[in-house]
A protein has these predicted regions:
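Active-site beta-loop-alpha junctions enriched in small/polar residues
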Residues: 6-10, 37-41, 79-83
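Short helix-capping and hinge/turn segments at secondary-structure transitions, especially at repeat
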Residues: 1-2, 7, 14
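Hydrophobic faces of well-ordered beta-strands that scaffold small-molecule active sites
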Residues: 1-3, 32-36, 74-79
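Gly/Pro-rich active-site loop or hairpin
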Residues: 11-72
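C-terminal helical cap(s) of enzyme catalytic domains, especially alpha/beta-barrels
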Residues: 84-98
Length: 98
């Protein structure tokens, strides 16, 4: 299955759920792909949303843990499209983690 880290964080933020507890209840041993980006928070509503922001260090370290703990993961997708320089930097950083 595909685990979208930002979607999980958005759900946890908006529903006030502990992220680690939520994540640990998923069948991550069946995950083959991870989507990587950082979520945003809407200023008016205060709700989190999948903003496809540049993946921050917290997200990258979480990805590193997931890759280490779940050997079924084969594919990583950085969901960031705003500028090529930051996309290249995030791809380089992800490669360093694996």
């Amino acid at each position: 299955f595909l685990f979208d880290l930002s979607h999980a964080r958005v759900t946890c933020y908006n529903k006030n759920i502990n992220f680690d507890r939520y994540k640990n209840n998923l069948p991550l041993d069946r995950a083959i792909q991870l989507h990587i980006c950082t979520f945003g928070i809407d200023k008016e509503s205060g709700l989190a949303y999948d903003a496809h922001n540049y993946p921050n260090e917290e997200e990258l370290l979480e990805i590193q843990k997931l890759i280490k703990n779940y050997k079924s993961i084969e594919y990583l997708t950085v969901e960031y499209y705003r500028d090529i320089e930051n996309l290249e930097a995030s791809l380089k950083r992800v490669r360093e983690l694996v």
